[in-house]
From Swiss-Prot:
Secretion signal, residue range per the UniProt entry: 1-18
Membrane listed as a keyword: no
Oligomeric and partner information: Monomer.
InterPro entries reported in the protein's UniProt record: A-amylase/branching_C (IPR006048), A-amylase_C (IPR031319), Alpha_amylase (IPR006046), Glyco_hydro_13_cat_dom (IPR006047), Glyco_hydro_b (IPR013780), Glycoside_hydrolase_SF (IPR017853)
Lineage: Eukaryota, Metazoa, Ecdysozoa, Arthropoda, Hexapoda
Record gene name: Amy-d
Protein name: Alpha-amylase A
Similarity remark: Belongs to the glycosyl hydrolase 13 family.
EC number: 3.2.1.1
Active-site annotation: 204 (nucleophile), 241 (proton donor)
Cystine pairs: 46-102, 153-167, 376-382, 448-460
Amino acid sequence: MFLAKSLVCLALLAVANAQFDTNYASGRSGMVHLFEWKWDDIAAECENFLGPNGFAGVQVSPVNENAVKDSRPWWERYQPISYKLETRSGNEQQFASMVKRCNAVGVRIYVDVIFNHMAADGGTYGTGGSTASPSSKSYPGVPYSSLDFNPTCAINNYNDANQVRNCELVGLRDLNQGNSYVQDKVVEFLDHLIDLGVAGFRVDAAKHMWPADLAVIYGRLKNLNTDHGFASGSKAYIVQEVIDMGGEAISKSEYTGLGAITEFRHSDSIGKVFRGKDQLQYLTNWGTAWGFAASDRSLVFVDNHDNQRGHGAGGADVLTYKVPKQYKMASAFMLAHPFGTPRVMSSFSFSDTDQGPPTTDGHNIASPVFNSDNSCSGGWVCEHRWRQIYNMVAFRNTVGSDAIQNWWDNGSNQISFSRGSRGFVAFNNDNYDLNSSLQTGLPAGTYCDVISGSKSGSSCTGKTVSVGSDGRASIYIGSSEDDGVLAIHVNAKL
C-alpha cells in the first residue's frame, strides 16, 4: 500500500508545475469560449477580431466525433462516439487550419476534451459516420469494448467518491481510466491535438475521474509543438472541470496539484454580488478568502455553457447575457481584477436549455452575422464582441501584473480601485448616483472611458475623465445609466 501511494505521489510530482502555464503569447490575457462555433469561423474571428483586440485564447467545443441526437441539442457534443476529428464544427483539415491561423495571430486554442465517458444509450450513429452500441459498450470507431469500462451503476450519492468516479454520469458509459489501453487511446487523442498546435485542454468531468489516473495521462503527454510558436519544453495548459461548492466527498484540492480547475465558486459569488445579494464593498479581499483555489490554479468566469442553462453550479444567481447591465459589470470586474485566468463566455441565444446552436437547415451550424457596431446577429450573442467586454480585455493587457491600489468604497455598492498607475475602474451597483472625487493612481491627463466608448485617434466616442496632477478625478456613474462601470487606462489617454 505504501509503495502504491509513493508511486501516485511521484506521478503527481512529475506533473506538478508543468500544466499551470497558459502558454499565452506575450502581452495577451483573456480567453473566450466560442461555444459551438465552426472551425472556419473561429479562424476568421482570430484574424479579424480576437487577435487585433488582444484576446489570448479560444476554448473550442469538443473536436471529436459525437452521437447525432434528435433535434441536435448542444449536449450531443458531450457524447463521444470516437476520437475522429469530425463534428458539426468541421473536419480535421478545417480544425488544423484554424489552429494554425489562430496561432499565427497570437491566439491560442484550448480544446474541450471528453474522456471520462462515451455516448449513452441511443447514441448509435456519429457525426463522422461511425456506429456504436452503447448498450453493449461497443465503440468500434476507437475501438473500445466492454473491457474498457467500469461496471454499470448510477451516481446517486455525491458523498461517495467511489460512486462519483466509478459509476455513470447520467447514463454516459463510464470509461476506466486506470486501464492501460484506455490511457493509451486517450494519450494518443490528446497528443494528436498537440501535434496540430493546440495550447491546452479543458478536461470535461474531471471530478468523475481518479486524480492518480489523470496524473498518469497528463504525465505522458507530448510537449507542445514548437512549429506553432511554443517555447521548447512547453506543456499543455490543463483546466479540469471540477465543481466543488463544498459539502461533498470530492474536493478541488485533489486536482489542483495536476492543473488548474474551473472555479465555479467564482461564478456563483460574482453573480450574488452583482445581483445585489452581497455588497460590492466586500470585494476588497476577492480571491482565496472567498474559498477559491489559488490564482494560478483558477480558471474564472461569470458564466459557462452549463450554468447559464441552470446546469452545473450556481443556480439562479448565475449572471448571463439575459441580464446585460449586471453581466457587463461582473465581466468588467473579473477582467479588471488580477485574480485567476479569466474566460469570457460567447453564447448563442436560447429559450430552451437543450437548444443547439443556430443552423441553416436544422443540422448544419450557421455562421454568425456581424453588425456594423461589432455585435452579432443570426442567433449568436457574441458577448466577446460587446465593447464593455473586449475593451476590458485590452485593459487587462495594459495593466499587466500591477497590483490593486487606491481601493475605495462607500460602505455599500460603490467601489473603485487602480491597477498600479496604469488603469482605474469604478463600479456603481447602488440605486443612487456615484459622484465622487476619487484617487485613480494615473498620471495627469484626459482619458477615454473604455466602457461607454473607445479611443479613436485623439478623440473618444464615450465619456472622458480628467485626472489632475494629484491623480484624483471626478467620477460620475448615474444609477440609471446603461453601464454601471467606468474604466480608464494609460493606453486610452487622449
